[in-house]
């Protein structure tokens, strides 16, 4: 008995064995390139090759008129891109999840699948399809609007500076609205039946039950969706590149940090690529995303814990 009491717990070495391959792959694919990018941002090409420049690249990005104008334009567009997703995609996702969680709704599995299906498509497919649909020359959008008597509302939205970015953002919303819908749907299903039954006993049903009972309980999930939206939007590149090209036309109206980084790092047309300045932009993007995630984790999430079971 004494030997059993004093026996040390067995070392779970197998945990390290199973984690090692995943940690190694993640380190090689994510961590090493990240530190390599941060390192490149402190160097610049000189006459004798690469030379340490300290924060000169960052001073150029924020201090040089040409660089700073492009950066702030891309950052402002990225913020608007994020705002549209927060104001359109996530509320629609919550609404769809609330409707699909109703057990009386027929064919809800078919609706859920059809809404989530665009998420599985590649950016290239989605971008080209919507570019063809919205084309004023051979697109079907003018004919569809004409069929319902709204042809006067049609405009070359992708060709106008005032509407291009919003149009691309709405296409992105159409593609990814299934993700917040599924997460909210799962959160709604995880609410204990006892809570809902108690609410019904108190006369709280229907829409009132959603606002007073369900919504506060799914706030942590909404917070996770918001931070995922933030990270995804500030890493966005593929859809804008597919629909508007590397120049993010018209007149850089759809230029976001991802396309600005691409042109700077790899070059485009007459612009020569500068990997060091591109790494500087990537480092700033990383700091922006890191700041947003830290604000959520240390300030917002801690206030939402009281809603969790």
State each model region's role:
Residues 1-5:
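Gram-positive cell-envelope targeting signals
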